[in-house]
Amino acid sequence: NTFELQDEDGTNINSSAFTAYSSAGTASRVYTITSPYTEAQLRDIKFTQSADVMYLVHPDVSIRKLTRTAHTTWTLTEADLLDGPYLDENTTATTMTPSHSSGDDRTITASTSTFASTDVGRLITFDSGYAKIITYTSGTVVKADIKDDFAGTSATTAWSLGAFSDTTGHPAATTFFEQRLVFGSTATEPQSLFFSQSADYENFKAGTDASDAMIFAIASDHVNVIRWLAGTRSLLIGTMGGEFIAKGGGTDSALTPTNIEIRKQSNYGCASIHPLSISNVTVFTQRAKRKLREMVYDYDTDSFVAPDLTILAEHITETGVVEQAYQKEPDSVVWCVLTNGKMVG
């Protein structure tokens, strides 16, 4: 229990006036929990939190829900989304036929090869009702647990497969906005936003009522893969090609399935690094990972602008940023981990 104190120049500090140090107390072990993520995936995890519940997303891993019910009671489970979201309804002649209209471990048969082994865990819906695929048998046959009863057992061309799966990829970004849980970007839908029902975070049953779930895609002349989401006065959307906002049309209008605007604000492009919400601004790393920008609302232009925070010292982050975090106290500091392993703030 002996040690030496030195200042930043390596000079020994005179500790003769310090009180004696003796070992006392023990440090509690940090709580650990098993997760499905590999070390290589850690930096691509995005998350959003509501009280004691946190949702975590990674494009290669199904959505996880971390719940704390006591200081030493934590659970990490797969999020059980209800009735969606789904891809567009089938437009081919392929039919689906369920063996039963209700129950678990029921057979669903496709008229042509449609399924893949990576569809296990994926949702499927018909004219009404939906099920979760639990077993892959072949390209035309799977077994599923029916979560909401089907209307019948007749063959139908009116079916849709879930938007999230190991086949299509899983969301790469998430946040809360206007009482909705929002996911963004999968491998097959890189520009799409998936909104839950209002105040019912895991219910993704879509419709046209104001509180219903909804899916919208960024319409642009380039592919703008969504990198991150942030909920502020508008929903901020960081993409590879630029920065967008989504909000309800009209002054102070809520975002609904029939009232949504998505507008581009700037063209800098974003890295896949979780943004930082600081006061009334959102700090993000530009696509090349060498600049930090703050996305802030500008009353003069009635839009969001993103000035360069590193313009006076661009050499500091020249090697590239891989992680960032915000310290509130005792001083307000944005800390960045660089590709060379150093940390700057």
Model-derived features: positions:
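Short, surface-exposed terminal/edge motifs of secreted or surface/virion proteins that either
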Residues: T2-E4, H58-E78, T140-A144, T188-F195
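Aromatic/His-enriched, Gly/Pro-containing loop or helix-boundary segments
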Residues: E8-A51, F150-G162, S211-V225, R263-C270
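Acidic glycine-/aspartate-rich tracts in secreted/extracellular proteins
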Residues: D9-G10, P59-V61, D148-F150, A187-E189, ...
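Autoprocessing Asn-cyclization modules and mimics
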Residues: N12-T32, R68, W74-W159, V305-T317
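Elongated alpha-helical scaffolds
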Residues: S35, E39-R64, L181, I237-G238
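Beta-propeller and closely related beta-pinwheel folds
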Residues: Y37, T157-D331
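Structural hallmark of WD40 beta-propellers
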Residues: D52, S332-V334
